[in-house]
Amino acid sequence: MKKYEIMYIIRPNMEEEAQKALVERFANVLTNNGAEIINTKEWGKRRLAYEINDLRDGFYMILNVNSNPEAVKEFDRLAKINEDIIRHIVVKEEE
């Protein structure tokens, strides 16, 4: 298993409960596919460097995970489809 850092930005206009459900759903996508979540950081609502889909702010989440590539690919696929995640990036950490 390799270490990855995943950062994603959620729409700022979501209700708090829906936001928590989204975070939990995407954490479950990783764990159900064999990943182990090491650390989760909520950066909270921050201003974006530039507008994305007419939004100026976003709710930032950062995950550090030990994972196989399949779990990360599934997360990436679902994050691209989901309209509540406005941006995401997956970085493989150096060993």
From Swiss-Prot:
Alphabetical UniProt keywords: Ribonucleoprotein, Ribosomal protein, RNA-binding, rRNA-binding
Example of a GO cellular component annotation carried by this entry: ribosome
GO molecular function, a single term: small ribosomal subunit rRNA binding
Full protein name: Small ribosomal subunit protein bS6
UniProt xrefs under Pfam families: Ribosomal_S6 (PF01250)
Similarity comment: Belongs to the bacterial ribosomal protein bS6 family.
CDD domains the UniProt entry points to: bS6 (cd00473)
Entry-linked SUPFAM superfamilies: Ribosomal protein S6
Biological role: Binds together with bS18 to 16S ribosomal RNA.
Species this chain originates from: Bacillus cytotoxicus (strain DSM 22905 / CIP 110041 / 391-98 / NVH 391-98)
NCBIfam families (UniProt xref): S6
Biological processes, Gene Ontology terms: translation
